[in-house]
Amino acid sequence: MDREALLQAVKEARELAKPRNFTQSFEFIATLKEIDMRKPENRIKTEVVLPHGRGKEAKIAVIGTGDLAKQAEELGLTVIRKEEIEELGKNKRKLRKIAKAHDFFIAQADLMPLIGRYMGVILGPRGKMPKPVPANANIKPLVERLKKTVVINTRDKPYFQVLVGNEKMTDEQIVDNIEAVLNVVAKKYEKGLYHIKDAYVKLTMGPAVKVKKEKAKKK
Protein backbone atom coordinates (compact mmCIF):
# COMPACT_ATOMS: atom_id res chain seq x y z
CA MET A 1 0.00 0.00 0.00
CA ASP A 2 1.44 3.31 -1.12
CA ARG A 3 2.83 5.44 1.71
CA GLU A 4 1.88 8.70 0.01
CA ALA A 5 -1.73 7.51 -0.28
CA LEU A 6 -1.74 6.69 3.43
CA LEU A 7 -0.30 10.12 4.28
CA GLN A 8 -2.95 11.82 2.15
CA ALA A 9 -5.73 9.86 3.87
CA VAL A 10 -4.41 10.74 7.32
CA LYS A 11 -4.17 14.41 6.33
CA GLU A 12 -7.74 14.44 4.99
CA ALA A 13 -9.10 12.64 8.05
CA ARG A 14 -7.45 15.26 10.24
CA GLU A 15 -8.88 18.13 8.18
CA LEU A 16 -12.43 16.70 8.06
CA ALA A 17 -12.75 15.98 11.77
CA LYS A 18 -14.28 18.78 13.82
CA PRO A 19 -12.31 19.91 16.89
CA ARG A 20 -13.44 18.25 20.11
CA ASN A 21 -12.73 18.94 23.77
CA PHE A 22 -10.77 15.70 24.04
CA THR A 23 -7.87 14.12 22.16
CA GLN A 24 -9.29 12.01 19.34
CA SER A 25 -7.76 8.71 18.32
CA PHE A 26 -6.79 7.67 14.81
CA GLU A 27 -8.26 4.38 13.66
CA PHE A 28 -7.34 2.25 10.66
CA ILE A 29 -10.02 0.10 9.06
CA ALA A 30 -9.47 -2.53 6.37
CA THR A 31 -11.88 -4.80 4.52
CA LEU A 32 -10.61 -8.10 3.16
CA LYS A 33 -11.37 -9.94 -0.07
CA GLU A 34 -11.06 -13.48 -1.43
CA ILE A 35 -10.55 -14.94 2.04
CA ASP A 36 -12.88 -17.55 3.54
CA MET A 37 -13.25 -16.25 7.07
CA ARG A 38 -15.28 -19.31 8.05
CA LYS A 39 -11.96 -21.13 8.22
CA PRO A 40 -10.20 -20.37 11.53
CA GLU A 41 -6.76 -20.46 9.89
CA ASN A 42 -7.71 -17.45 7.73
CA ARG A 43 -8.68 -15.25 10.66
CA ILE A 44 -6.29 -12.72 12.12
CA LYS A 45 -5.83 -12.50 15.85
CA THR A 46 -2.47 -11.04 16.70
CA GLU A 47 -0.72 -8.30 18.62
CA VAL A 48 1.15 -5.46 16.95
CA VAL A 49 3.64 -3.23 18.76
CA LEU A 50 3.22 0.24 17.26
CA PRO A 51 6.56 2.04 16.74
CA HIS A 52 5.16 5.34 18.02
CA GLY A 53 2.76 3.90 20.57
CA ARG A 54 -1.02 3.81 20.71
CA GLY A 55 -1.50 7.50 21.48
CA LYS A 56 -3.09 6.41 24.72
CA GLU A 57 -1.51 3.82 26.96
CA ALA A 58 -3.09 0.41 27.20
CA LYS A 59 -4.80 -0.32 30.50
CA ILE A 60 -3.23 -3.33 32.19
CA ALA A 61 -4.26 -5.45 35.17
CA VAL A 62 -1.97 -7.83 37.03
CA ILE A 63 -3.28 -10.91 38.83
CA GLY A 64 -0.80 -12.02 41.45
CA THR A 65 0.65 -11.95 44.93
CA GLY A 66 3.80 -10.85 46.71
CA ASP A 67 6.50 -9.26 44.56
CA LEU A 68 4.38 -9.38 41.41
CA ALA A 69 1.57 -7.44 43.06
CA LYS A 70 4.08 -4.97 44.51
CA GLN A 71 5.64 -4.34 41.08
CA ALA A 72 2.18 -3.78 39.59
CA GLU A 73 1.34 -1.23 42.28
CA GLU A 74 4.63 0.60 41.72
CA LEU A 75 3.90 0.73 37.98
CA GLY A 76 0.44 2.14 38.62
CA LEU A 77 -1.39 -0.92 37.32
CA THR A 78 -4.60 -2.51 38.55
CA VAL A 79 -3.87 -5.34 40.99
CA ILE A 80 -6.13 -8.36 41.41
CA ARG A 81 -4.99 -10.57 44.29
CA LYS A 82 -5.34 -14.34 44.59
CA GLU A 83 -8.19 -14.12 47.11
CA GLU A 84 -10.23 -11.95 44.70
CA ILE A 85 -10.23 -14.48 41.85
CA GLU A 86 -12.99 -16.75 43.18
CA GLU A 87 -14.99 -13.72 44.32
CA LEU A 88 -14.89 -12.25 40.80
CA GLY A 89 -15.94 -15.60 39.38
CA LYS A 90 -19.12 -15.34 41.42
CA ASN A 91 -19.70 -11.69 40.48
CA LYS A 92 -19.89 -11.81 36.69
CA ARG A 93 -21.12 -8.21 36.43
CA LYS A 94 -18.05 -6.88 38.24
CA LEU A 95 -15.78 -9.16 36.21
CA ARG A 96 -17.29 -7.92 32.95
CA LYS A 97 -16.62 -4.32 34.01
CA ILE A 98 -13.00 -5.17 34.82
CA ALA A 99 -12.60 -6.98 31.49
CA LYS A 100 -14.03 -4.02 29.60
CA ALA A 101 -11.86 -1.51 31.46
CA HIS A 102 -8.56 -3.25 30.66
CA ASP A 103 -6.79 -4.02 27.40
CA PHE A 104 -4.41 -6.67 28.76
CA PHE A 105 -4.03 -8.94 31.76
CA ILE A 106 -0.81 -10.37 33.20
CA ALA A 107 -0.96 -13.22 35.71
CA GLN A 108 1.27 -15.20 38.01
CA ALA A 109 1.73 -18.50 36.17
CA ASP A 110 0.76 -20.75 39.07
CA LEU A 111 -2.58 -18.94 39.35
CA MET A 112 -3.62 -19.68 35.76
CA PRO A 113 -5.67 -22.83 36.61
CA LEU A 114 -7.63 -20.82 39.18
CA ILE A 115 -8.05 -17.92 36.76
CA GLY A 116 -9.23 -20.26 34.02
CA ARG A 117 -11.80 -21.80 36.34
CA TYR A 118 -13.29 -18.60 37.74
CA MET A 119 -12.49 -15.87 35.20
CA GLY A 120 -12.00 -17.71 31.93
CA VAL A 121 -15.68 -17.68 30.99
CA ILE A 122 -15.56 -13.86 30.78
CA LEU A 123 -11.95 -13.18 29.75
CA GLY A 124 -11.65 -16.01 27.20
CA PRO A 125 -14.34 -14.96 24.68
CA ARG A 126 -13.04 -11.39 24.85
CA GLY A 127 -9.53 -12.48 23.92
CA LYS A 128 -8.21 -11.22 27.24
CA MET A 129 -6.89 -14.32 28.98
CA PRO A 130 -3.81 -13.27 30.98
CA LYS A 131 -0.22 -13.58 29.85
CA PRO A 132 1.41 -15.93 32.38
CA VAL A 133 4.69 -14.90 34.00
CA PRO A 134 6.78 -16.47 36.79
CA ALA A 135 6.08 -15.18 40.31
CA ASN A 136 9.57 -13.63 40.46
CA ALA A 137 9.49 -12.09 36.97
CA ASN A 138 10.44 -8.48 36.26
CA ILE A 139 7.28 -7.38 34.47
CA LYS A 140 8.39 -3.85 33.56
CA PRO A 141 9.67 -4.74 30.02
CA LEU A 142 6.44 -6.64 29.27
CA VAL A 143 4.33 -3.77 30.58
CA GLU A 144 6.24 -1.22 28.48
CA ARG A 145 5.67 -3.35 25.37
CA LEU A 146 1.98 -3.87 26.07
CA LYS A 147 1.45 -0.14 26.54
CA LYS A 148 2.37 0.27 22.85
CA THR A 149 0.48 -2.79 21.65
CA VAL A 150 -2.79 -3.11 19.75
CA VAL A 151 -4.68 -6.26 18.83
CA ILE A 152 -5.95 -7.09 15.34
CA ASN A 153 -8.89 -9.46 15.64
CA THR A 154 -11.07 -10.22 12.62
CA ARG A 155 -12.96 -13.05 14.29
CA ASP A 156 -15.06 -14.49 11.43
CA LYS A 157 -15.63 -11.14 9.69
CA PRO A 158 -13.78 -9.93 6.54
CA TYR A 159 -12.61 -6.68 8.11
CA PHE A 160 -10.80 -5.23 11.11
CA GLN A 161 -10.52 -1.88 12.88
CA VAL A 162 -7.52 -0.95 14.98
CA LEU A 163 -6.17 2.01 16.96
CA VAL A 164 -3.08 3.59 15.34
CA GLY A 165 -2.44 6.75 17.38
CA ASN A 166 -4.00 10.09 18.22
CA GLU A 167 -4.37 13.55 16.72
CA LYS A 168 -1.38 14.93 18.67
CA MET A 169 0.93 12.66 16.68
CA THR A 170 2.34 13.66 13.28
CA ASP A 171 0.99 12.28 10.01
CA GLU A 172 4.28 10.44 9.51
CA GLN A 173 4.00 8.76 12.92
CA ILE A 174 0.44 7.65 12.21
CA VAL A 175 1.50 6.16 8.88
CA ASP A 176 4.47 4.39 10.48
CA ASN A 177 1.99 2.78 12.87
CA ILE A 178 -0.37 1.83 10.04
CA GLU A 179 2.51 0.24 8.15
CA ALA A 180 3.36 -1.85 11.23
CA VAL A 181 -0.21 -3.17 11.11
CA LEU A 182 -0.01 -3.80 7.36
CA ASN A 183 3.25 -5.73 7.76
CA VAL A 184 1.46 -8.21 10.01
CA VAL A 185 -1.37 -8.65 7.49
CA ALA A 186 1.14 -9.05 4.65
CA LYS A 187 2.84 -11.91 6.50
CA LYS A 188 -0.45 -13.63 7.32
CA TYR A 189 -1.55 -14.37 3.76
CA GLU A 190 0.31 -15.90 0.84
CA LYS A 191 -0.75 -13.02 -1.43
CA GLY A 192 -0.12 -10.47 1.30
CA LEU A 193 -1.79 -7.09 0.95
CA TYR A 194 -3.57 -8.18 -2.23
CA HIS A 195 -6.30 -9.40 0.10
CA ILE A 196 -7.03 -5.89 1.38
CA LYS A 197 -10.05 -4.74 -0.58
CA ASP A 198 -10.35 -1.23 0.84
CA ALA A 199 -8.70 0.72 3.64
CA TYR A 200 -9.86 3.75 5.59
CA VAL A 201 -8.46 6.18 8.16
CA LYS A 202 -10.60 8.14 10.62
CA LEU A 203 -10.50 10.13 13.82
CA THR A 204 -12.83 9.13 16.67
CA MET A 205 -15.62 11.57 15.78
CA GLY A 206 -14.68 12.16 12.15
CA PRO A 207 -15.70 10.55 8.85
CA ALA A 208 -13.79 7.62 7.39
CA VAL A 209 -11.43 8.63 4.56
CA LYS A 210 -10.72 5.98 1.95
CA VAL A 211 -7.07 5.31 1.13
CA LYS A 212 -6.60 5.78 -2.60
CA LYS A 213 -5.23 2.78 -4.43
CA GLU A 214 -2.11 2.89 -6.56
CA LYS A 215 -2.85 3.36 -10.22
CA ALA A 216 -1.74 0.50 -12.41
CA LYS A 217 1.45 1.43 -14.21
CA LYS A 218 1.41 1.35 -17.99
CA LYS A 219 3.68 -1.23 -19.54
Swiss-Prot record:
Q: Which GO terms describe its cellular component?
A: large ribosomal subunit
Keyword Methyltransferase, does the record have it? no
InterPro entries for the chain: Ribosomal_uL1, Ribosomal_uL1-like, Ribosomal_uL1/biogenesis, Ribosomal_uL1_3-a/b-sand, Ribosomal_uL1_arc, Ribosomal_uL1_CS
Q: Which CDD domains match?
A: Ribosomal_L1 (cd00403)
One GO biological process this protein is involved in is: translation
| One MF annotation (Gene Ontology) recorded for this entry | structural constituent of ribosome
Does the record's keyword annotation contain RNA-binding? yes
**Taxonomically, which superkingdom?**
Archaea
Alphabetical UniProt keywords: Repressor, Ribonucleoprotein, Ribosomal protein, RNA-binding, rRNA-binding, Translation regulation, tRNA-binding
Instruction: Tell me the Pfam families matching this sequence.
Output: Ribosomal_L1
Q: Which family does it belong to?
A: Belongs to the universal ribosomal protein uL1 family.
What does the subunit comment say? Part of the 50S ribosomal subunit.
User: Which NCBIfam families does the record match to this protein?
Assistant: PRK04203.1
Briefly state the protein's biological role: Probably involved in E site tRNA release. Binds directly to 23S rRNA.
The molecule here is called Large ribosomal subunit protein uL1
